[in-house]
């Protein structure tokens, strides 16, 4: 099973790095499943390498883990001011490579023309996900759901 997991990791990461136009990493640098991509990659290709790396692990967990699959949270994927070609690749990559039946929470200032075919929540208050006017409603809803867990 270990060999299957490691093989899957290498295959996925190699494929994802190519899709995201990351060519500066050698296979020897990312071949070990314990490698730390963030310390090996610099510049504008670093965010793309990290997205490839994280999505590889999302797919590994989906395929090989029996535990509950958590939502994927990607905040501001346009790091290091990607050029237009690369930000397009990043957005399309996220859209096309989200593991099947997974929930994605994507924090974006702009969609760059990619239709993620999902519910969009527009935040209107800086540094706030919830609005003060909604606290009581959300509190009641959450208490109700938590109470159901204990029944």
Predicted regions and their residues:
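Conserved ABC ATPase signature
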Residues: 31-54, 77-85
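Short, well-ordered alpha-helical segments
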Residues: 3, 7, 11, 47-52, ...
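GG-anchored amphipathic helix commonly corresponding to the ABC/SMC/Rad50 NBD signature/C-loop
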Residues: 46-71
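Hydrophobic alpha-helix feature that most strongly marks membrane-spanning transmembrane helices
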Residues: 62, 78, 82, 95-103
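Extended helical coiled-coil dimerization/tether regions that scaffold
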Residues: 1-42, 63, 67
